[in-house]
């Protein structure tokens, strides 16, 4: 029995943190810790808000880190760089890809350069003045307002009037000290598609998110309030649209130099055009989260998905890419 335990991969499960998505992170980590195969893995928990010195001290005895941090210092390359310094491999993208995807403004520039369709937008740098009349003149109404570097729809709002635009910008600034994005609101169907792999990429089945009647879009409450939205996987869409979404998800993954896995969100507009919204490098990881649902639609259960992410992370560390 002792020999069997010695062969188990020693996993540092990193969660918590200090961002506004702390509780989401901890909930996901509870599920992952429960689901990880105890015959394969020996799991230790670390909260990045308090346990980084302990993680550094334990580095020599850790085989792999599973990151379940969201938002600031989790998805932006910070923890990835720390683990690189410690020589601990981890799942998902490295410093560069994580930082690019976390900065929604910069990511949209990369999408645009890769000829991927995006809604028009303006970015207001932290502390900069802006003219609401010019934003409305250039982009029209309604407008989506959100922090450029936050996740889980934190700080996001929909503005139908100039007054709502000003309130939305102030709200976003309350939620983030960084830049604010103002972009055209595209009314349509919300679709999302995950990608698995390092070099050989696989797009998973497309999932459609149908927010409840009280939600104009998939905001924080619609994401995490039970019953607030319906998720349909595989999405009931035409084959041509499904192929386009999967193609664009892979191209977004490549454009941002991502590794291991990602999930890209889209809107299929009422104008019949597909628009890319953003890419998430550490998607939610509860059993009912989108990525596990998409994996399940291919026949991959949650434990197998976790195994795959760990295997891809170990493969990435050997190749020293991303």
Swiss-Prot record:
GO cellular component terms attached to this protein's record: cytoplasm
Gene Ontology MF annotations: ATP binding; D-alanine-D-alanine ligase activity; metal ion binding
Alphabetical list of Pfam families matching this protein: Dala_Dala_lig_C, Dala_Dala_lig_N
Family, as annotated: Belongs to the D-alanine--D-alanine ligase family.
Protein name: D-alanine--D-alanine ligase
Source organism superkingdom: Bacteria
Pathway annotation: Cell wall biogenesis; peptidoglycan biosynthesis
UniProt keyword annotation of Transmembrane present: no
Enzyme class: ligase
Gene source species: Desulfotalea psychrophila (strain LSv54 / DSM 12343)
Binding site for Mg(2+) 2: 278, 280
Cofactors, names only: Mg(2+); Mn(2+)
């Amino acid at each position: 029995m002792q020999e069997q335990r010695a062969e188990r991969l020693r996993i540092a499960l990193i969660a918590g943190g200090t961002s506004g998505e702390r509780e989401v992170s901890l909930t996901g980590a509870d599920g992952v810790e429960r689901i990880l195969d105890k015959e394969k893995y020996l799991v230790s928990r670390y909260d990045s808000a308090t346990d980084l010195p302990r993680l550094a001290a334990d580095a020599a005895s850790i085989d792999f880190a599973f990151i379940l941090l969201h938002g600031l210092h989790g998805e932006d390359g910070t923890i990835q760089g720390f683990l690189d310094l410690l020589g601990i491999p981890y799942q998902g993208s490295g410093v560069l890809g994580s930082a690019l995807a976390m900065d929604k403004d910069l990511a949209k520039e990369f999408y645009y350069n890769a000829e991927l369709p995006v809604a028009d937008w303006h970015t207001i740098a932290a502390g900069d003045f802006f003219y609401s009349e010019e934003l409305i003149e250039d982009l029209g109404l309604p407008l989506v307002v959100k922090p450029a570097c936050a996740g889980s729809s934190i700080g996001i709002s929909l503005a139908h009037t100039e007054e709502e635009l000003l309130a939305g910008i102030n709200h976003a600034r309350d939620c983030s000290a960084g830049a604010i994005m103002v972009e055209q609101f595209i009314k349509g169907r919300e679709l999302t598609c995950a990608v698995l792999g390092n070099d050989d990429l696989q797009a998973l089945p497309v999932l459609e998110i149908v927010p409840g009647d009280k939600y104009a879009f998939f905001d924080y409450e619609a994401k995490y309030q039970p019953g607030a939205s319906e998720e349909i996987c595989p999405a009931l869409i035409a084959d041509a649209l499904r192929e386009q979404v999967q193609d664009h998800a892979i191209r977004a993954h490549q454009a941002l130099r991502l590794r291991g896995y990602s999930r890209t969100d889209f809107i299929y507009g009422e104008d019949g055009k597909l628009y890319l919204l953003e890419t998430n490098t550490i998607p939610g990881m509860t059993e009912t989260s989108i990525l596990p649902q998409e994996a399940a639609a291919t026949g991959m259960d949650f434990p197998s998905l976790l195994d795959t992410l760990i295997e891809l992370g170990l493969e990435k560390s050997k190749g020293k890419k991303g």
